[in-house]
UniProtKB/Swiss-Prot annotation:
Species assigned in the record: Plasmopara viticola
Secretion signal span: 1-23
Family that this chain belongs to: Belongs to the RxLR effector family.
Record-given protein name: Secreted RxLR effector protein 71
Domain notes: Has the canonical translocation RxLR motif, but lacks the canonical EER motif, which characterizes most oomycete effectors identified so far.
Keywords recorded for this protein, A-Z: Glycoprotein, Secreted, Signal, Virulence
Compartment annotation: Secreted; Host cell
Length: 321
């Protein structure tokens, strides 16, 4: 549809005002540079979509927004452009939709009329998006029976656990750590690989995570290129190292059951298997305890420099093995 008459000034005004619909104060670093880059890209996309009918205008502007990295500082709520393009791209997919968008290295949340869309990833593999329905009730619900997208209802008053068959599961998700040093506790240079794995500066607190170390088989060891599946890592040695990729994550339960990798050593640093809780013990595996923002405990595979840290006494999160 070509803009004629009053549509041209309205669309031009929309392109100018769209980057300023911010949910919070913008960062002062290179703010005008990114806005000018977005306007240049958006005007080019508008002219291209006006002359050719190959792509829709909403997809072009969405691509310009992500390409100029305005999502790092701006959260556009209930935008018809993002709502339309992302819902069309995410909801019909049964797995994970990947779009060829570079330079987006952090999960972003887009609030639409039907729920919340989380996008994460970046680099050569592209960006992945998921639609998650948020509910304010305290009860735990199962997945959406439609099966188009693995939709889970998250209970906000409770700790961040996804629901599967009415039972909560611990939330372990991995994202790349690149340009967000403020998420890591500056008092611990090893980033949680020491005796006490506590992360006080993780934002937001209800979405803490831990990953398993890097590998050539994917972005991180133990996590394949698809964020919804867990794969067995290639064991290069007898220990696993906890990498430095921590950050907020969407509450998505992997399709496969939680898998705990085995190590040849019985327990690191003299820890014995009888000191472990039954939920964390599988054969000769020693697990370390990581606390998320709410203080509830979760178990990760044993690391070479990791000691056993007992979980809080009052822990409301149930772990399914």
């Amino acid at each position: 549809m070509r803009p004629t008459g009053w549509r041209w000034p309205v669309l031009s005004l929309l392109l100018v005002l769209l980057p300023f619909q911010a949910a919070g104060p913008p960062r002062p670093r290179a703010a005008w540079t990114r806005i000018v880059s977005f306007l240049t890209c958006a005007l080019t996309a508008l002219a291209a979509s006006w002359m050719t009918a190959t792509r829709t205008l909403s997809n072009e502007i969405t691509h310009c927004l992500t390409l100029t990295r305005l999502f790092r500082r701006y959260t556009i709520v209930n935008s018809w452009l993002l709502d339309r393009s992302l819902r069309e791209a995410v909801l019909p997919s049964k797995t994970v939709t990947r779009m060829a968008i570079d330079q987006l290295w952090w999960p972003r949340k887009y609030t639409s009329t039907n729920g919340t869309i989380w996008c994460w990833g970046g680099g050569p593999s592209g960006i992945s998006c998921r639609w998650i329905r948020i509910n304010t009730c305290a009860s735990c619900r199962t997945a959406d029976p439609s099966g188009n997208a693995r939709v889970y209802t998250v209970a906000r008053p409770q700790p961040p656990t996804c629901c599967s068959n009415g039972r909560p599961r611990p939330l372990f998700r991995t994202f790349r750590y690149r340009t967000l040093p403020y998420l890591i506790n500056p008092k611990r240079a090893n980033n949680g690989a020491g005796p006490r794995q506590r992360f006080r500066n993780v934002y937001p607190p209800r979405l803490a995570t831990v990953s398993l170390g890097r590998d050539g088989n994917g972005p991180v060891r133990g996590i394949s290129s698809s964020p919804t599946r867990l794969t067995r890592p290639r064991m290069g040695g007898n220990t696993l190292r906890v990498s430095r990729t921590f950050g907020p994550v969407p509450c998505i339960v992997p399709e496969a059951k939680p898998w705990t990798p085995r190590v040849k050593r019985r327990c690191p640093l003299g820890a014995t298997s009888r000191r472990l809780r039954p939920q964390a013990r599988r054969g000769n595996v020693c697990a370390c305890v990581v606390e998320n923002g709410y203080g509830t405990a979760g178990y990760v595979p044993a690391a070479a420099r990791c000691r056993l840290v007992r979980p809080p006494v009052r822990s409301t999160t149930r772990f399914s093995t």
